[in-house]
Amino acid sequence: MDRIRIRGGRPLEGVIDISGAKNSALKVMVAGLLTDERLELENVPALADVATMAQLLAQHGIAVEETGAKQLSVGGAITNTEAPYDIVRKMRASILVLGPLLARTGEARVSLPGGCAIGTRPVDLHLKGLEAMGAEIALDGGYINARAPKGLHGATITFPFVSVGATEQLLLTATLAEGETVLVNAAREPEIGDLADCLNKMGADISGIGSDRLTIRGVKALHGARHTILPDRIEAGTYACAAAITGGGVLLRGARMFDLGALASTLGEAGVDVTEVAEGVTVSRRNGLHGTDAMTEPFPGFVTDMQAQFMTLMAVAEGASMITETIFENRFMHVPELNRMGARINVHGSSAIVRGVPGLSGAPVMATDLRASFSLVLAGLAAKGETIVNRVYHLDRGYEAVERKLAACGADIERLRD
């Protein structure tokens, strides 16, 4: 099992190219189920989760082929409507094949999903929304069995709380449902806008993109299209924290300030200079960090996928800060590992109190999930001495070429292969 070794204390200086967004690429790949024609995708990151999605789509008869650097061609006729446990368990986004399979074939059998071990993250809203559109659903032996013997129809669906996954599920499905579907209190994340843009290129009729009210008018069929995946705002935010925690300065080439949402202003409050420029976003920190509170919220609020990284930054800030997690439970699993490196963090329910320390010390640590894994890398970059991050397969699910990108900016980092 691979590990990453870091010798900390070096400011990051240089340019980091931001990859395509994992959380968009996976969903846009699923859109390939909605047509027999080919979907040509550009700026696709080379990640373990992308490979897993390609494996899942192949299970359904959809071929995913590399056509060039960061380019994929997705397409084919559906030959199988079952998504098996051994693939679905690896990645939560796998659940999104349910609606498209149902819309195209009238039936689907999909295992309940896996992914990071972050709380329960139920799929109730997915299933209730599909039922409102005419689906018949039963749970049996860890599988979702869905049928639509009379086809799917439009519906007005109001989410009781914002759900990115449920919004994506019903957005994909409604493109081929008869009539009009309205999603009220829909998630507004940039990746959802990117998915909607791709679907419209394929012939869908979606309006309200970027708002919390999406209107989808079903069409008879979708066709192939070419689409470029938007830059990964989580990767950009993560490297912004890397520049800040090392006291360096980097250009995040391709990053978009708007997509960072509340993270940009929160970093500013903490003493980090975040500036939009023609090529992307620059991030620098020449003076001290200040303890700053953060509460995770749906976009454009502070994104939950940056909570662990920002907490690491606050671990070396002057003063105290409180980080509150409102999206997922059980998302503080990185705290004991950070404390092993000298951080002073106490968890109280859904909040963590972070009391800044002058510095961290290198130590062997264990990654527990995707974003937590990079929080430990950040700690290693700032720490005195050597840090070994174990279980970096979590990291490979969502970050492309981590060692290369960091080393190019001056980090002393290498991958150890067992």
UniProtKB/Swiss-Prot annotation:
Pfam families: EPSP_synthase. UDP-N-acetyl-alpha-D-glucosamine binds at R92, R121, P122, V123, D124, L125, D305, I327. The keyword Nucleus does not apply. It is found in: Cytoplasm. It comes from the Bacteria. One of its GO terms (molecular function) is UDP-N-acetylglucosamine 1-carboxyvinyltransferase activity. Keywords: Cell cycle, Cell division, Cell shape, Cell wall biogenesis/degradation, Cytoplasm, Peptidoglycan synthesis, Pyruvate, Transferase. It catalyses: phosphoenolpyruvate + UDP-N-acetyl-alpha-D-glucosamine = UDP-N-acetyl-3-O-(1-carboxyvinyl)-alpha-D-glucosamine + phosphate. Phosphoenolpyruvate binds at K22, N23. Pathway: Cell wall biogenesis; peptidoglycan biosynthesis. The keyword Magnesium does not apply. The active site is at C116. It is an enzyme of class 2 (transferase). Transmembrane segments: none annotated. GO terms for cellular component: cytoplasm. Its main location: cytoplasm. The modification 2-(S-cysteinyl)pyruvic acid O-phosphothioketal is found at C116. One of its GO terms (biological process) is UDP-N-acetylgalactosamine biosynthetic process. Its EC number is 2.5.1.7. Cell wall formation. Adds enolpyruvyl to UDP-N-acetylglucosamine. PANTHER family: UDP-N-ACETYLGLUCOSAMINE 1-CARBOXYVINYLTRANSFERASE (PTHR43783:SF1). Belongs to the EPSP synthase family. MurA subfamily. This is UDP-N-acetylglucosamine 1-carboxyvinyltransferase. It comes from Acidiphilium cryptum (strain JF-5). The gene is murA.
